[in-house]
Regions:
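Nucleic-acid endonuclease domains
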Residues: 1-66, 73-171
């Protein structure tokens, strides 16, 4: 897991690519979702050294890295993520990406964690289907049907970034 301090520049760039006027079906945080998601995209794009999309581009993925279409999923957190933290996407979305990167974003937007990454084909093999209305042991209740893996199921982004023999070695 890679911890990242959020800078004012990152916040500014996230506001530029987010669209606060759009509230997508099945998002978890209402109109804030665009900004939260954009901030997660900025974190991953900066780490990978690529450019994220802008708010008029691409539904199926957020950026391209090493010929892989990357979709970033960001979750607002009140505490740093752990190995057992959920990484999920709602079943509503049918995005056509090659890889998912998962980011945990501290509620005050001061820090983020790139929790890991996984090829989309492997995500759906490993993910558990969680039905709307299911309540976790910590009291959180899912508002939508979700596909869920844990942080421990993801590949380390440091290993993926340093790998020169092909991504399949680590994913």
């Amino acid at each position: 897991m890679k911890e990242v301090s959020i800078t004012d520049d990152m916040r500014k760039r996230a506001r530029l690519i987010s669209n606060p006027d759009v509230v997508f079906n099945q998002n978890k945080t209402g109109s804030r979702a665009g900004y939260i998601g954009a901030l997660g995209e900025i974190v991953v794009a900066d780490y990978l050294g690529v450019k994220p999309h802008n708010n008029n581009e691409v539904y199926n993925y957020d950026m391209v890295w090493n010929d892989n279409n990357i979709e970033v999923k960001t979750m607002n957190l009140y505490y740093p993520p752990k190995e057992g933290t959920d990484c999920c996407t709602t079943t509503y979305y049918d995005q056509k990406c090659d890889m998912y990167f998962f980011v945990g974003l501290l509620n005050d937007k001061s820090k983020a964690w790139i929790e890991g990454c996984i090829y989309s084909k492997d995500f759906f093999k490993k993910a558990n289907y969680i039905k709307k209305g299911t309540t976790r042991s910590d009291g959180f209740t899912y508002k939508w049907d979700n596909w869920v893996v844990k942080v421990k199921d993801l590949s380390s982004v440091d290993k993926v970034l340093s790998n020169t023999t092909g991504l399949d070695t680590f994913l």
